[in-house]
């Protein structure tokens, strides 16, 4: 009996539970029906509101239906025929489809894609709306992803769902989970599916509910007439209503114009080079240097902004890869000028990749009246690798480049790598050694580029290089500049493969090795790029069966090549095109080339002592300074008298010479040449002569040096100067210009006025200091030398007896107390032309001669000193400067008592008095 009672009790319990379930079910159904009645009316009036939502996803808001329908006005952009709508319930999602008879889909959309679609998913409405509305535009202040109710300060949580009684629904068909009287009724009939999963109890008055689609469709059909009336009225006031709601009415949105950087625009034109992302109505002509993605970025298949000028190879790639209409592509021939808006343009090979080009722009220069007065040449390098052969391009040879748009990718001293042919040769050598039939070779490439290595390997090994189908199609576009037979798409016939740079990693190389089915036992990869190793041609890394070579093969100019390019073309202005977004960066880039300009601009005195012609200097600096003076009364030429003071560390003598000039008004072209070469090694001037005289001018040139070049005692200066003056007066009656020994200026006497030229040029002063330093160092070296003891020599001496001295000899006159007459010792490079030069070799130095002078004078001539001494002498005296025989320093001993001292002996000795470099 107990078992029967238990069964009965269980049956009764189950019956009660079933009754409770039915009761709960009926109660919930009644509640939902009541809610449906209230929300249906609201939904029918709010349906048009959803069509005005312009964001990608929205959330609907509903109220209790107490709004007055008469106060509602539909959006202005809904036509009468657009008022019918369809709402379909599918798995808790409402799909709203609206038919637009007057709607025209965009060109790239199908008819089905042109209609608006509203997708309700997880309490969110996804709204897709076309962009071609004539009268409507989305407000700026509305988020394009979600539109939250203005009165709601929270967002829906899709993970939680609540009922009216506060209990949770687990959304499960299992009846064991219905402990809280929750009913999960999952029926396949969408028309009778009252879903309770999305009912949520909120403290606010807004909630969402998904209703039966049949009821909604019926309500829509019943209210069509009402909507048609309202829409016909709103056509008149649609724009005003939109303005009240804050919408901006415009047909097409305007995008902000991008301003291109200066290095993308050719100065003086509206030409844009490699700047397609900055396309606008301001530019109608666009230039593409080569087909690399960082240069053609901005070009799409819908390009219609202007002509694209490029080479034939690049034009084929633009059409093939990007799908640009052929009518916008202008393929230009190599090395041929074309005219675009009055500007001549030419494409030259840039040695970068197939089809890459330098672009030369020749822009006419006009005056205010519009007349052409000249032309300006601008060169844009794009990406290039400089080669000496570019100097011989017919369109560039001898042309002055005003602006150079420079590819400065490797403008850094650390990027110095060998030339391309050398790197290709090294790679080919490695392949030849390692190609044993069991090695797979990988070569990193770009879309285009690095083809020279591939062609060399295929030529050397006699096998083509495998490329992908896409790569092969690209190479076919370049068939005019490379051999397409060197490439194949069959990887089974060759161990050489061209891969992308990303494939040159350890794991990728291993995977390729494994996929070869043991055909290859090891793999070698080459990464040809100049970024990897500066100043090293090839480096490698070995790891198991993989070997990785980093090759300094670059298709950009190295640092040295950039300097060679600038040094050759010498543009007026350099405009960098890489990493130049700030003035500091531009300044640092240009600093690498500043020395190339400075060395050309500086005119230093050092050039006078080099083996370079100095004709221009003398003709410009001493122009009309050494021309003959014409006596207007006698119509005769007055001889030019030059007074030269010679400095050999110590001021030992003065030499006065008078140069007779031919009585001819024509230039002396038969005696002078156009250049002057100074031989620094021998301290001599060549026998070439410089034309320094011209007609129609007159001047008297004197170069006088102050006496304090050297440290001499006042007594010696006075005695020597007095004797010099006496001797010069006796021997040269017409010369009165040797008395001023305290002037350190170049005096030009021209009739009445005196033109004084000081040596105050900064370059002259800086070089003079350098020369003084050299002389000072030489003097110190000479003071430390051990000099030989003078030997006594007997011989017959005349009044103008001379002593020949070499630059290494030092001579000093030993004074005597019993000398009755003062003697002067004159040193001059021109004194070797005197009549007594035959007696120079017979002179010997005597230490015990009683007629030796008191003063000790140093007469040694270091090499650098004789350069300076001769320089000032030559500037002053055309005879001494351009004499046929090189001058030799000498000492001239002069006596006032010629008859008494014929047999006397003159003794010279060495003095090591303090020597100071001369100052300006």
Swiss-Prot record:
Organism: Dictyostelium discoideum
Intracellular or extracellular location(s): Nucleus
Keyword Nucleus belongs to the record: yes
SUPFAM superfamilies, alphabetized: Metallo-hydrolase/oxidoreductase
Compositional bias ranges of the Low complexity kind: 163-200, 715-742, 777-841, 856-865, 890-920
Pfam families according to UniProt: DRMBL
Name of the protein in its database record: DNA cross-link repair 1 protein
InterPro entries on file: DRMBL, RibonucZ/Hydroxyglut_hydro
PANTHER family: DNA CROSS-LINK REPAIR 1A PROTEIN, DNA CROSS-LINK REPAIR PROTEIN PSO2/SNM1-RELATED
Biased composition (Polar residues): 84-95, 115-127
């Amino acid at each position: 009996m107990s078992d029967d009672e238990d069964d009965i009790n269980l049956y009764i319990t189950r019956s009660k539970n079933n009754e409770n379930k039915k009761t709960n079910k009926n109660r919930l159904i009644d509640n939902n029906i009541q809610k449906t009645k209230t929300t249906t009316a609201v939904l029918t009036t709010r349906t048009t509101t959803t069509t005005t939502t312009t964001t990608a996803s929205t959330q609907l808001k509903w109220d209790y239906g107490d709004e007055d329908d008469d106060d509602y006005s539909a959006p202005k952009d809904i036509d009468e025929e657009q008022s019918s709508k369809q709402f379909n319930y599918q798995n808790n999602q409402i799909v709203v489809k609206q038919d637009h008879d007057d709607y025209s889909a965009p060109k790239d959309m199908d008819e089905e894609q042109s209609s608006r679609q509203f997708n309700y998913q997880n309490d969110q409405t996804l709204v897709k709306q076309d962009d071609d509305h004539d009268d409507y535009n989305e407000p700026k202040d509305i988020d394009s992803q979600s539109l939250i109710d203005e009165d709601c300060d929270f967002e829906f949580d899709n993970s939680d769902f609540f009922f009216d009684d506060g209990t949770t629904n687990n959304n499960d068909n299992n009846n064991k989970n219905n402990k809280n009287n929750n009913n999960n009724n999952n029926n396949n009939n969408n028309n009778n599916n009252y879903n309770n999963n999305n009912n949520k109890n909120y403290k606010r008055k807004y909630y969402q509910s998904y209703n039966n689609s049949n009821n909604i469709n019926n309500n829509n059909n019943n209210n069509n007439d009402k909507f048609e009336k309202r829409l016909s009225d709103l056509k008149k006031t649609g724009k005003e209503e939109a303005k009240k709601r804050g919408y901006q009415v415009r047909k097409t949105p305007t995008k902000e114009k991008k301003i291109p950087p200066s290095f993308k625009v050719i100065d003086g034109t509206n030409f844009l080079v490699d700047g397609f992302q900055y396309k606008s109505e301001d530019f109608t002509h666009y230039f593409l240097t080569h087909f690399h993605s960082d240069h053609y970025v901005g070009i799409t298949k819908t390009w219609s902004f202007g002509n694209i000028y490029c080479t034939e190879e690049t034009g084929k790639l633009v059409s093939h890869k990007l799908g640009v209409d052929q009518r916008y592509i202008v393929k230009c021939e190599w090395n041929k000028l074309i005219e675009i808006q009055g500007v001549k343009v030419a494409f030259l090979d840039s040695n970068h990749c197939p089809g890459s080009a330098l672009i030369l722009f020749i822009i006419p220069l006009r005056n205010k009246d519009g007349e052409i007065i000249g032309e300006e040449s601008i060169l844009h390098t794009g990406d290039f690798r400089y080669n000496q052969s570019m100097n011989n391009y017919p369109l560039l040879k001898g042309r002055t480049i005003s602006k150079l748009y420079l590819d400065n990718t490797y403008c850094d001293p650390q990027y110095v790598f060998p030339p391309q042919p050398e790197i290709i040769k090294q790679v080919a050598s490695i392949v030849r050694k390692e190609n044993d039939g069991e090695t797979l070779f990988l070569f990193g490439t770009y879309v285009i580029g690095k083809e020279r290595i591939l062609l060399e390997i295929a030529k050397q090994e006699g096998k083509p290089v495998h490329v992908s189908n896409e790569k092969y199609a690209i190479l076919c576009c370049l068939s005019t500049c490379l051999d397409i037979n060197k490439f194949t798409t069959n990887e089974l016939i060759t161990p050489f493969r061209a891969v992308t740079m990303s494939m040159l990693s350890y794991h990728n190389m291993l995977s390729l090795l494994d996929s070869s089915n043991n055909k290859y036992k090891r793999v070698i990869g080459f990464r040809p790029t100049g970024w990897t190793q500066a100043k090293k041609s090839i480096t490698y890394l070995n790891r198991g069966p993989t070997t990785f070579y980093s090759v300094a093969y670059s298709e950009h100019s190295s640092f040295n090549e950039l300097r060679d390019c600038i040094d050759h073309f010498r543009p007026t202005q350099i405009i960098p095109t890489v990493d130049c977004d700030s003035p500091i960066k531009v300044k640092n880039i240009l600093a690498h080339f500043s020395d190339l300009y400075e060395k050309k601009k500086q005119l230093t005195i050092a050039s006078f002592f080099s083996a370079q012609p100095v004709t221009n200097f003398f003709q410009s600096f001493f122009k009309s300074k050494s021309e003959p003076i014409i006596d207007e009364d006698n119509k005769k030429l007055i001889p030019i008298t030059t007074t030269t003071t010679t400095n050999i560390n110590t001021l030992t003598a003065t030499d006065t010479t008078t140069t007779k000039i031919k009585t001819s008004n024509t230039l002396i072209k038969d005696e002078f040449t156009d250049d002057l070469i100074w031989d620094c090694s021998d301290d001599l001037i060549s026998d070439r002569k410089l034309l320094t005289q011209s007609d129609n001018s007159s001047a008297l040139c004197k170069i006088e040096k102050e006496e304090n070049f050297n440290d001499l005692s006042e007594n010696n200066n006075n005695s020597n100067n007095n004797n010099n003056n006496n001797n010069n007066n006796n021997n040269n009656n017409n010369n009165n210009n040797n008395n001023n020994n305290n002037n350190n200026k170049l005096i030009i006497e021209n009739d009445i006025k005196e033109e004084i030229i000081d040596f105050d040029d900064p370059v002259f002063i800086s070089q003079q200091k350098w020369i003084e330093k050299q002389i000072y160092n030489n003097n110190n070296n000479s003071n430390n030398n051990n000099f030989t003891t003078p030997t006594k020599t007997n011989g017959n001496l005349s009044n103008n007896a001379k002593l020949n001295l070499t630059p290494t000899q030092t001579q000093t006159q030993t004074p005597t107390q019993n000398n009755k007459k003062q003697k002067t010792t004159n040193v001059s490079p021109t004194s070797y032309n005197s009549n007594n030069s035959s007696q120079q070799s017979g002179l010997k130095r005597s230490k015990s001669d009683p007629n030796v002078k008191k003063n000790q004078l140093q007469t040694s001539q270091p090499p650098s000193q004789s350069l300076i001494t001769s320089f000032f002498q030559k500037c002053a005296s055309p005879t001494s400067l351009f004499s046929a025989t090189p001058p030799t320093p000498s000492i001239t001993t002069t006596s006032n008592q010629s008859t008494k001292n014929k047999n006397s002996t003159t003794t010279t000795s060495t003095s090591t008095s303090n020597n100071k470099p001369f100052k300006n």
